[in-house]
């Protein structure tokens, strides 16, 4: 999970914006 979250933070720093970071966190919580 930490690896996924780390990648999400990388996307968050990308031009996509913080929305991608929030989406990743939601996916982490949604997945078991």
Swiss-Prot record:
Origin: domain of life: Eukaryota
GO terms (BP aspect): blood vessel diameter maintenance; regulation of blood pressure; vasodilation
Molecular function terms from GO: hormone activity; toxin activity
Cysteines joined through disulfide linkages: 8-24
Keyword vocabulary terms for this entry: Disulfide bond, Hypotensive agent, Secreted, Toxin, Vasoactive, Vasodilator
Predominant localisation class: secreted
Tissue: Expressed by the venom gland.
Compartment(s) of residence: Secreted
GO CC annotations on file: extracellular region
Misc: The hypotensive effect is not mediated by the natriuretic peptide receptor-A (NPR1).
Main function: Snake venom natriuretic peptide that exhibits hypotensive and vasorelaxant effects. Produces a dose-dependent hypotension in rats, followed by significant increases in concentrations of markers of nitric oxide (NO) formation measured in the plasma and vasorelaxation in a thoracic aortic ring bath. The peptide may exert its hypotensive action, at least in part, through stimulation of NO production. The vasorelaxant effect is endothelium-dependent and does not appear to be mediated by the natriuretic peptide receptor-A, as its action is not modified by isatin (a potent NPR1 antagonist).
Similarity field: Belongs to the natriuretic peptide family. Snake NP subfamily.
Protein name according to UniProt: Natriuretic peptide Coa_NP2
Organism of this sequence: Crotalus lutosus abyssus
